[in-house]
Swiss-Prot record:
<dbReference type="GO" id="GO:0005524">
    <property type="term" value="F:ATP binding"/>
</dbReference>
<dbReference type="GO" id="GO:0006633">
    <property type="term" value="P:fatty acid biosynthetic process"/>
</dbReference>
<dbReference type="InterPro" id="IPR029045">
    <property type="entry name" value="ClpP/crotonase-like_dom_sf"/>
</dbReference>
<dbReference type="GO" id="GO:0016743">
    <property type="term" value="F:carboxyl- or carbamoyltransferase activity"/>
</dbReference>
<protein>
    <recommendedName>
        <fullName>Acetyl-coenzyme A carboxylase carboxyl transferase subunit alpha</fullName>
        <ecNumber>2.1.3.15</ecNumber>
    </recommendedName>
</protein>
<comment type="similarity">
    <text>Belongs to the AccA family.</text>
</comment>
<dbReference type="InterPro" id="IPR011763">
    <property type="entry name" value="COA_CT_C"/>
</dbReference>
<keyword id="KW-0275">Fatty acid biosynthesis</keyword>
<keyword id="KW-0444">Lipid biosynthesis</keyword>
<dbReference type="GO" id="GO:2001295">
    <property type="term" value="P:malonyl-CoA biosynthetic process"/>
</dbReference>
<dbReference type="Pfam" id="PF03255">
    <property type="entry name" value="ACCA"/>
</dbReference>
<dbReference type="InterPro" id="IPR001095">
    <property type="entry name" value="Acetyl_CoA_COase_a_su"/>
</dbReference>
<comment type="function">
    <text>Component of the acetyl coenzyme A carboxylase (ACC) complex. First, biotin carboxylase catalyzes the carboxylation of biotin on its carrier protein (BCCP) and then the CO(2) group is transferred by the carboxyltransferase to acetyl-CoA to form malonyl-CoA.</text>
</comment>
<keyword id="KW-0443">Lipid metabolism</keyword>
<keyword id="KW-0547">Nucleotide-binding</keyword>
<comment type="subunit">
    <text>Acetyl-CoA carboxylase is a heterohexamer composed of biotin carboxyl carrier protein (AccB), biotin carboxylase (AccC) and two subunits each of ACCase subunit alpha (AccA) and ACCase subunit beta (AccD).</text>
</comment>
<keyword id="KW-0276">Fatty acid metabolism</keyword>
Amino acid sequence: MKNYLNFETDIKNLEIEIDKLKDPYNQDGLSEVDTKKISESQKEIDNKLQEIYSNLDPWQTTLVARHEDRPKAKFFIDNLFEDFIPLSGDRYYGEDKSVLAGFAKFDEKSVLVIGQEKGDSLESRIERNFGMMRPEGYRKTIRLMKLANKFNIPIISFIDTPGAYPGVGAEERGQAEAIAKSIECCMSLNVPTLAIVIGEGGSGGAIALASSNKVIMLENAIYSVISPEGCATILWRDPKRTLEAAKAMKLSSKDLLELKVIDEIIPEPIGGAHRDRDLILDNVRKSIEKNLNEFFNMSGEEIFNHRKNKFLTIGRSKGFVNQIDDLSTLSMKESKVNLFIKNFFKSKLNLAVLFGVIVLLGYFIFSL
């Protein structure tokens, strides 16, 4: 059974009509299938899909990104890679099933694949914790990313999460620290890293694995610091103002490409990735091939600096960026006070004088 969003009512009615036309037993007695009418209805559906999906507002895009039938990380891993060997455990606490991770072959080359998995049924969604990673999940991926870096293996991550799991147990086990360490690990790697946002890219739960050389989004995916509902609730105490929040947050792929937060948009079939899985699979495959080839002849240091420059450039004014050729050499200028203090304590004579002053002050204070 197909699942429809609240703005797809017309499409739902047309597709129900087509299903009836395709089944001659639906009518009284036997009759021939009216292929002409089916063809006309299909054209009407295609036109309606084009009309709706070429004018999606940010909140509707959010609903498409969360669509129940949307391809998940496991689908891409199973169909894009060969000889996938899943690896488990963080070597500290346990296994987190909300993230799939392991080594595989892509175009006959070894890669590390990481995928935040939401699940596609009630049982699997509960098992996968709806794609919300726990600290042990991030520590598992850190362990594997360091291993990939050691053997010079590229890393491909599929991002699809509403956010990191905010439960009490996760917080007790150091959720914030695990996310911070994951970002630190991603930024320190000397191998090419690609992050593909296939659905929701929610807050720190996403950025922990998306601090990559290339951040790529499917056309109808979203990437934001908080959900529109959460933003509306915090700012206006009104969760119904989701459209207003979604517009202000600039969470769509087009907005983020314009802001240079992401590097590329992978086009989806009209109506969303779930309507033509073969096409979206082919588009993702081509994007991975193209982006991995870009780093083929680069050294580890060049790859590291490419990533560092990319994130240092985000949010900078054009004038500032144009004055610096290599942002990887950028450092904060120390204040005169900090420089004086640092240089003062380097001198043994200064330390001896300071010690003498402290002794004299102590003598006068206690003699009063």
